[in-house]
Amino acid sequence: KVQEICRRHDVLLHIDEVVCGVGRTGTWFGYQNYGVEPDMVTMAKGVASGYAAIACLVTTEEVFDLFKSDATDPMDYFRDISTFGGCTAGPAAALENMAIIEEEGLLENTTAMGARLMENLHALMEKHAVIGDVRGAGLFCGAELVADRVSREPVAEKLAQAVTADCMAQGVIVGVTNRSVPGYNNTLCFSPALIATPDDIDAITDAVDGALTRVFG
């Protein structure tokens, strides 16, 4: 719907893929799951998989050409200046990272392991009434903890944090939302590595199972 509005009013559509881009949802970019065609895409984090600092904005030739005053001059292009501009280590790591994702079939693995993760989370939802909803795409999932499934009243944030602390004590890192409206940071966040195995996925949800039992009974 947003894309339709942008096209209608000749507005460029900019999509942020810093978190969900480069394979996280089982496709190269999250927007590809929804048939969207952005004009600009920002990305970071997974671009070099953390091995080098790099972030970038990618756009279409049509948009890029708007920054040129002379389209026939190959040296007439948009420039910016930054402290680390021109550092080739980041792009080199990014290219190698993307090659590994392709060569090792990590998009396919992310889709398969994401399906397993969601299946396990749904099983936990049947077991623990405190889970009000599970959602996600690929290896980018969440489990919402609620005091009441009907009203969707969130559990106290300290209880959600107690769950992640218990998981950490088991050697499993699970996130929890921390930038929502105060009182609504109650969703457990899961984003395993794209190379995750079935055993890894099961270990994550087993840890959560134990943590929920200890925190909520």
Residue ranges and their predicted role:
Residues 1-217:
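Conserved N-terminal phosphate-binding loop of PLP-dependent enzymes in the Aspartate aminotransferase
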